[in-house]
């Protein structure tokens, strides 16, 4: 038999010498417990003897290492002979103190100096005398004993025994320490006295010592006196000078907190008393403790507590009365002189003076300074533990590692995440509180933890939340669970916000270029934070200029109103020319007969102004043949950069003896005479040539220039990349040394003639050079070029609408990789706009570094103002080589300012901000780098493997002073003009605009005969009401309809109702039932016109024959469906039961003016048609999908941080990763559309009155356009229809088709159906067969694990109870910890607890509360506001409820609720559920066919068809996996539950049938269901439909034919064969060999 222990030893690589030793001779494995969920393996081993400690530790370490990739490990040891060696015993003892369960500093630091002694069968722990020993024994000794058991010592009992020798030794050591401390204090006293002098207001001169007040010590009868007397002449120590332990220290001070505590020793049973005080002197505060040794001392403890309590009550009373004279409030305070030893209290983790003498002192000294100390302690400033002095050294978090700290450290920083955790002990049930938060000092971040002791600490901890700045002290330890370093907190004190930047300038600038987090993957701040910062600095306005979009406008608008800041609405758009020419300086010449000079230049950088030519090379060609060459290097006058040489291959040796520039230029001009110039990306080469010609007094290029880049783009639009390398590769043209001008020029020439020949091949007949631009340039040529940035700002409301149009055109008509704005579109919609020159990608800046001053001047005329940034924002251009120095950059900015002044256009210094503060730069860095090198923003320097990211600029929000400093290279007047004066003047030119309207705008509808929506709703309402309830109507119905119609018509809501009615009617006409969501079922008008089936009237009977009406509005029935069946007393016809008692106020509010939100559940099959119905009703220009914005979520941001850490060689702790991820969230990543939301534009307006438009996720092939704004932003201003898809209507439609039963005829109180909610009887099955207690599996809303548990506990009996179940299961904090507890305790039953929101209003009205008050209470409760409203308001509601006998449990239940479900929504759900359940009970095979066709999402058709045993085995397999089961397995388990139920009821599954199976739906064959094709693994819906379509064309003669006609893969064919689907079918049809002959 295999020795498992030996196998384990081999696996963990235990050294052979140990494995063969006597220690392991008879060792064995008794048991191995594998905890799958927690990934823990627990080995239980047995040995002959207790192992030596070193062997035991090696065993545990090797096991842990060997299994580290699989699971955590634990080892428990037992020994057959428990011979205890005292040395080994103590070795294990010291080892135990290092284990996590016992390494608490308060315990291990004291007990590690003790030792164990064995006395016969007893084991004693030799300890010193310690008053806290009972506490330690009770808390830690059971753990210690359990550990020794796991070490192999068996059941041991460890008892403490006081070691007198040790006690004396410790006392002597302590005395030595105190003596040293007193010696040090001698030197301190002079310093203390000097500081006291300085603080004394009464001193006359620096050298005059304050007279010490005479204190009178009083006897016990006259005051407080414990222990020996304290001499009035003894030196008094200031509390602030205590830094460590000390002996014989005396304090004098005021007692401001006191507590008398008692505890009973577990061993002795003795009651111990301790007095705990907090005292203050004029320098600080301190904790004092005094153990009660005598009865008379203990008696005075309560006297002290009483005195201090009275003082604190006076302080509170004075402040309540509006007084805050803190010093006067201390007039009756208790003053003490105390003497004792200062020790570090491990339990409190602080220094405490343990007093041996206490004396009350009178008269009291001046208390002003002491009052300040107490006030600081009692102020709003948060403090946990001891004070941390300002002069204590603060450690940067980045410098802390696991091995760099020894002892406490102090951090200072910002809390960015925190929680107070309540932890319940599994063993004892005791609740402990753990404070956990994360903080950063922006060098790194740290986890901080503290176990809280006492209510005071818990209450303080609740205030430690994100946003707090604090100083903390504690010890750094590694937390294995968090896998990071954690500061174990001892002390915390709130500090003022650090590093706050202020705008101290008397006059403030206005920022005109600001990005929010709606600049896609490029900026960090929300619009709210941006505007709040501007307001904080006193800026009167700020401009929003996101990239290509306006999605931050609604938030900015709200923030502007809130903060009193004018919002200037703008955008940084992508400007393109309408058509990009192929030929510049075009003339009418024959392009096939002309001579061409194909040239290329190499330069030292990208700027024609600041970089130099180093090579000009050209090939002169005629009819495709080279006829001459030109190749000259040029000496720039300085050494070439490494980057230039790397890119071009040109070295200093190439250029050092080259000809002068002027000579080369004149020679080249002569070479080019009478030719057409050709270049690839000609604007670059021509720009450099013209700049150098101009500088050297030579004429610029005027002959035609052909750009082969644009030639290729227009000739081969299907290509994606048009670089010279890609093109030469495609056309097999040699390019040996790319980026050397001579080789590039020759390759470009050969490409030109390839293109000309292509034109000839296409028989275009074009010969003139003019025809290239006129006929070849595509209308879409703008799509391929790199756009130039331009900033657009709306000055007026008309301008804002034009801005909406421009952005819409860019996102819809001209979208190509990003939204583009053709210049013609901008010019056509320029009214009301200002146009700025934008950034370094703008054409003005581009011209300034690449063109002559005159050319730049001409380009700048298009703009209304010129923008310049601080030099730091152009950093990438300097690093990338466009500028050789900062001076060149500064000169360019001066040139731009000069251009502005020359043209009379204002120049504005703007910040191009992308984040708020300098420390936020890392967040943008992470976001931008996540895009990958070469992305639009993530520019690189170099190519291929040498490519490196260029640095991102310092793009924080700058104060006025910071901006002025950035432009300090200008004269002071100019700097002030562009930073302050011009920005303020321009801000004043803008109107106050409103991008989001205040009112609701609905379309106007006119029907046949001129009937308006208002007239139609009235007509339809009363037609149905009279049909159901007679004419005249009963008063209660007439009043209800009149009230509702008054609200609907008066607020313009009729069109909302009528649109919904029309959509429901159209879906009904197509054979589908429509379910309602939300509170629309609260409206009787909605019921009457057919929007919802839910009837909100009180439970009632009505007669369909004679309209008899009988109503129960006293609350005696929760639903009309629960009333007994009854015949009409007038005509004896069976009465219809209806009504759920739902107030109208829950839909449109108490005043009836809340915008109606009608959500409808259409069948998923019919939803697309319902969407198109809206477009059909209103027109394509007035119906849009509701837009959504997808932002970077926390998990995605976490991935970005980890990617950045990997790609850029960083290392972050987990807390720092949390911070960086949190800072990177919320940035716009994509756009989308609401799954069912349709926005309807009024037909008397257009969409640009409300929002720009775009395609969802920039998909230009999408069927619908969406609103550009997130639909929530315009929800209250425009009609939104929620046309949602749901499975329930699809199920009902399927069941109706199968059965012919009309859904409305199904009773809502069928007894068999109701029994499903109490057991399995209706199914004819037992609980054991089914595996669950109820029959609700597969019933909508009622078949989940959670809902079934709730049903089983709540025991619903009728429809009203099911409404409660629906409300309880959808609410938050309504069931768990609330209604559940009430039902369990018998205080209330299901019918009386709060289930749905409407129940509160109805219940309170029935109790007698006024309707308005009942409504208000309901609103406060349902929104979770009960505990957030002011206490006085809440108390008013509670009083009113108590006055009307509302039970206390009901009031308490209200206080716990966070969210509540509407009753109308619950009613609609339950009606659908009961209809489905009816088929499950009475037509089971139809039900299962529908359920598996529509609801099931995962299949294992092999198991399902294999019978009950196979199904149950598979269910057990998945269940045993627990949380390790995959999502697919979890979904499959749900399918198998219904499969098991179906099989148990006697039905079966057949196998897939090639000629009978459908694509997606099951087919009924007697008591058998034939599965559809999609139930096969790997066979999708499209292929399934193709098989069915091919089958309709004729029989499949072979598997090969099935593959071809059905589009089926070979893998699927093999699976079908294995499943027997293709039984008897040959692999190939022999006749097919001759198909080609027919």
Swiss-Prot record:
Enzyme superclass (EC): transferase
Stretches for region Disordered: 193-212
Keyword match Mitochondrion: no
Keywords: Cytoplasm, DNA replication, DNA-directed DNA polymerase, Exonuclease, Hydrolase, Nuclease, Nucleotidyltransferase, Transferase
Subcellular location: Cytoplasm
Catalytic activity field: DNA(n) + a 2'-deoxyribonucleoside 5'-triphosphate = DNA(n+1) + diphosphate
EC number: 2.7.7.7
GO biological process, one term: DNA-templated DNA replication
Residues in Exonuclease domain copies: 596-752
Basic and acidic residues bias: start-end ranges: 194-212
GO molecular function per UniProt: 3'-5' exonuclease activity; DNA binding; DNA-directed DNA polymerase activity
InterPro entries, per the entry: DNA_pol3_alpha_NTPase_dom, DNA_pol3_finger, DNA_PolC-like_N_II, DNA_PolC-type_N_I, DnaE2/DnaE/PolC, DNAPol_HHH, DnaQ, Exonuclease_RNaseT/DNA_pol3
One matching Pfam family: DNA_pol3_finger
GO CC annotations, alphabetized: cytoplasm
Keyword Ribonucleoprotein (UniProt): no
Domain of life: Bacteria
Function: Required for replicative DNA synthesis. This DNA polymerase also exhibits 3' to 5' exonuclease activity.
Name of the featured protein: DNA polymerase III PolC-type
Gene that produces this protein: polC
């Amino acid at each position: 038999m295999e020795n498992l222990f030996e196998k384990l030893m081999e696996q963990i690589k235990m050294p052979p010498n140990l494995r063969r030793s006597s220690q392991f001779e008879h060792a064995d494995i008794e048991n191995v417990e594998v905890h799958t969920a927690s990934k823990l393996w627990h080995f239980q081993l047995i040995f002959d003897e207790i192992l030596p400690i070193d062997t035991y530790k090696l065993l545990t370490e090797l096991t842990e290492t060997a299994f580290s990739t699989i699971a955590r490990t634990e080892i428990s040891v037992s020994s057959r002979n428990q011979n205890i060696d005292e040395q080994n015993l103590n070795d294990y003892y010291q080892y135990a103190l290092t284990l996590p369960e016992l390494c608490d500093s308060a315990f291990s630091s004291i007990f590690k100096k003790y030792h164990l002694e064995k006395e016969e069968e007893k084991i004693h722990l030799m300890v010193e005398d310690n008053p806290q020993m009972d506490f330690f024994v009770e808390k830690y000794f059971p753990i210690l004993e359990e550990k020794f058991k796991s070490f192999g010592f068996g059941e041991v009992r460890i008892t403490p025994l006081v070691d007198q020798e040790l006690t004396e030794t410790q006392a002597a050591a302590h005395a030595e320490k105190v003596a040293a401390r007193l010696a040090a204090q001698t030197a301190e006293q002079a310093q203390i006295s000097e500081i006291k002098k300085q603080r004394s207001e009464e001193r006359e001169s620096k050298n005059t010592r304050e007279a010490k007040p005479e204190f009178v010590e009083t006897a016990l009868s006259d005051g407080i006196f414990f222990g020996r007397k304290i001499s009035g002449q003894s030196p008094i120590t200031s509390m602030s000078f205590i830094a460590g332990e000390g002996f014989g220290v005396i304090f004098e001070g005021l007692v401001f907190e006191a507590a008398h505590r008692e505890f009973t020793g577990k061993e002795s049973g003795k009651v111990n008393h301790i007095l705990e005080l907090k005292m203050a002197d004029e320098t600080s505060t301190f904790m004092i403790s005094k153990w009660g040794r005598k009865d008379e001392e203990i008696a005075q403890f309560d006297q002290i507590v009483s005195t201090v309590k009275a003082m604190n009550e006076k302080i509170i009373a004075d402040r309540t009365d509006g007084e805050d004279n803190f010093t006067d409030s201390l007039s009756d305070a208790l003053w003490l002189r105390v003497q004792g030893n200062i020790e570090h209290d491990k339990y409190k983790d602080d220094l405490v003076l343990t007093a041996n003498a206490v004396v009350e002192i009178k008269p009291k000294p001046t208390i002003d300074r002491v009052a300040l100390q107490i006030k600081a302690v009692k102020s709003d400033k948060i403090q946990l533990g001891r004070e941390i002095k300002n002069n204590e050294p603060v450690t940067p978090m980045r410098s802390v590692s696991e091995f760099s700290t020894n002892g406490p450290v102090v951090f200072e920083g910002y809390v960015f995440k925190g929680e107070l955790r309540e932890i319940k002990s599994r063993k004892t049930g005791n609740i402990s509180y753990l404070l956990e938060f994360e903080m950063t000092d922006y060098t790194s971040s740290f986890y901080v933890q503290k176990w809280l002791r006492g209510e005071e600490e818990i209450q303080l901890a609740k205030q430690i939340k994100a946003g707090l700045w604090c100083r903390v002290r504690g010890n750094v330890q590694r937390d294995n669970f968090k896998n990071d370093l954690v500061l174990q907190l001892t002390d915390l004190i709130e500090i003022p916000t650090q590093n706050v930047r202020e705008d101290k300038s008397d006059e403030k600038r206005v920022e005109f270029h600001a990005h929010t987090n709606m600049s896609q993957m490029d900026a960090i701040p929300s619009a709210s934070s941006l505007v709040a910062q501007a307001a904080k600095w006193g800026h009167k306005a700020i401009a929003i200029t996101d990239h290509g979009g306006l999605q931050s406008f609604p938030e900015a608008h709200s923030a502007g109103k809130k903060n009193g800041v004018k919002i200037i609405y703008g955008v940084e758009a992508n400007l393109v020319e309408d058509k990009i020419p192929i030929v510049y300086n075009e003339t009418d010449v024959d392009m096939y007969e002309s001579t061409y000079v194909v040239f290329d230049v190499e330069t030292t950088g990208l700027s024609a102004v600041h970089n130099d030519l180093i090579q000009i090379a050209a090939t002169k060609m005629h009819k495709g043949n080279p006829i001459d060459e030109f190749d000259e290097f040029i000496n720039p006058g300085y050494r070439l950069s490494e980057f230039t040489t790397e890119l071009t291959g040109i070295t200093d040796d190439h250029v050092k003896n080259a000809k002068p520039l002027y000579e080369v230029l004149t020679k080249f001009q002569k070479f080019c005479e009478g030719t057409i110039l050709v270049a690839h990306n000609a604007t670059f080469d021509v720009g450099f040539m013209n700049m150098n010609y101009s500088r050297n007094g030579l004429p610029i290029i005027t002959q035609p220039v052909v750009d082969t880049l644009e030639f290729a783009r227009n000739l081969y639009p299907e290509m994606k990349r048009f670089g010279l390398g890609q093109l030469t590769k495609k056309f097999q043209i040699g390019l040996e040394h790319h980026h050397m001008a001579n080789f590039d020029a020759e390759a470009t020439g050969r490409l030109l003639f390839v293109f000309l020949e292509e034109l000839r091949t296409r028989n275009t007949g074009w010969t003139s050079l003019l025809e290239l631009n006129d006929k070849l340039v595509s209308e879409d040529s703008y799509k391929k070029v790199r756009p130039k940035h331009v900033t657009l700002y709306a000055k007026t409301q008309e301008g804002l609408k034009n801005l909406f149009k421009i952005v819409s055109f860019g996102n819809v008509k001209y979208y190509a990789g990003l939204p583009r704005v053709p210049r013609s579109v901008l010019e056509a919609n320029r009214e009301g706009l200002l146009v700025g020159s934008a950034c370094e990608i703008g054409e003005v800046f581009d011209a300034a570094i690449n063109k002559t001053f005159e050319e730049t001047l001409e380009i700048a005329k298009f703009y209304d103002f010129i923008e310049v940034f601080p030099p730091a924002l152009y950093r990438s251009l300097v690093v990338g080589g466009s500028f050789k120095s900062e001076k060149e950059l500064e000169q360019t900015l001066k040139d731009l300012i000069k251009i502005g002044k020359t043209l009379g256009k204002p120049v504005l210094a703007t910040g191009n901000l992308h984040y708020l503060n300098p420390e936020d730069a890392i967040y943008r860095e992470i976001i931008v780098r996540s895009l990958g090198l070469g992305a639009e923003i993530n520019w690189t320097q170099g190519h291929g493997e040498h490519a490196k990211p260029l640095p991102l600029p310092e793009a924080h929000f700058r104060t006025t002073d910071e901006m002025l400093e950035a432009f300090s290279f200008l004269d002071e007047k100019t700097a002030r003009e562009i930073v302050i004066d011009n920005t303020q003047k321009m801000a004043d030119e803008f109107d106050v605009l409103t991008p989001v309207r205040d009112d609701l705008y609905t379309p106007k509808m006119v029907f046949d005969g001129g009937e308006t929506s208002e007239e139609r709703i009235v007509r339809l309402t009363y037609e149905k009401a009279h049909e159901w309830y007679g004419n005249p109507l009963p008063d209660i119905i007439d009043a209800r309809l009149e009230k509702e119609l008054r609200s609907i018509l008066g607020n313009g809501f009729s069109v909302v109702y009528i649109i919904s009615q029309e959509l429901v009617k159209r879906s009904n006409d197509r054979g589908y039932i429509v379910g309602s969501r939300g509170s629309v079922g609260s409206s009787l008008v909605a019921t009457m016109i057919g929007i919802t089936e839910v009837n909100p009237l009180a439970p009632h009977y009505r007669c369909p024959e004679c309209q008899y009406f009988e109503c129960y509005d006293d609350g005696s029935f929760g639903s009309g469906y629960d009333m007994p069946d009854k015949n009409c007393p007038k005509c004896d016809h069976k009465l219809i039961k209806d009504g759920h008692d739902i107030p109208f106020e829950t839909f449109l509010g108490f005043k009836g003016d809340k915008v109606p939100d009608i959500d409808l559940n259409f069948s998923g099959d019919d939803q697309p048609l319902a969407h198109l119905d809206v477009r059909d009703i209103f027109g394509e220009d007035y119906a849009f999908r509701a837009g959504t914005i997808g932002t970077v979520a926390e998990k995605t941001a976490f991935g970005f941080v980890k990617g950045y850490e990997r790609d850029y060689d960083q290392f972050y702790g987990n807390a720092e990763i949390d911070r960086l991820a949190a800072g990177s969230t919320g940035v716009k990543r994509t756009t989308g559309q609401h799954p069912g939301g349709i926005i309807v534009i009024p037909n008397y307006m257009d969409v640009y009155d409300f929002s720009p438009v775009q395609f969802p996720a920039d998909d230009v092939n999408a069927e619908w356009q969406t609103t550009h704004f997130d639909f929530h932003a315009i929800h209250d201003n425009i009609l939104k229809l929620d046309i949602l898809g749901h499975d329930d209507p699809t199920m009902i439609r399927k069941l109706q088709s199968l059965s012919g039963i009309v859904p409305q005829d199904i009773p809502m109180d069928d007894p068999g159906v109701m029994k499903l909610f109490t057991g399995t009887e209706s199914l004819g099955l037992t609980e054991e067969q089914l595996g669950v207690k109820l029959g609700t599996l597969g019933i909508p809303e009622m078949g989940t694990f959670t809902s079934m548990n709730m049903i089983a506990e709540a025991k619903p009996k009728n429809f009203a109870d099911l409404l409660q179940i629906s409300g309880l299961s959808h609410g938050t904090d309504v069931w768990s910890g609330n209604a559940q507890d009430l039902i369990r305790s018998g205080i209330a039953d299901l019918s009386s607890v709060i289930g749905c929101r409407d129940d509160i209003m109805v219940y309170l009205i029935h109790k007698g509360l006024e309707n308005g008050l009942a409504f208000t209470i309901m609103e406060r409760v349902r929104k979770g506001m009960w505990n957030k409203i002011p206490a006085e308001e809440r108390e008013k509601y509670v009083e009113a409820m108590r006055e009307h006998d509302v039970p206390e449990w009901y009031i308490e239940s209200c206080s716990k609720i966070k969210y509540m479900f509407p009753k109308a929504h619950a009613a609609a759900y339950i009606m659908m559920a009961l209809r489905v359940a009816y088929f499950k009970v009475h037509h089971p095979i139809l039900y299962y066919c529908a359920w598996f066709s529509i609801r099931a999402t995962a299949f294992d058709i092999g198991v399902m068809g294999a019978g009950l045993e196979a199904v149950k085995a598979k269910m057990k397999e998945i269940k045993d996996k627990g949380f390790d089961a995959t999502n697919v397995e979890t979904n499959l388990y749900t399918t198998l539950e219904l499969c098991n139920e179906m099989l148990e009821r006697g039905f079966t599954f057949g196998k897939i049938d090639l000629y009978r199976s459908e694509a997606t739906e099951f087919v009924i064959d007697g008591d058998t269901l034939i599965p559809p094709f999609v139930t096969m693994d790997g066979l999708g819906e499209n292929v399934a439909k193709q098989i069915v379509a091919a089958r309709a064309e004729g029989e499949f003669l072979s598997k090969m034919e099935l593959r071809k006609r059905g589009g089926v893969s070979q893998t699927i064919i093999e699976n079908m064969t294995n499943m027997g689907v293709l039984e008897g079918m040959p692999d190939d049809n022999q006749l097919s060999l001759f198909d080609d002959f027919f």
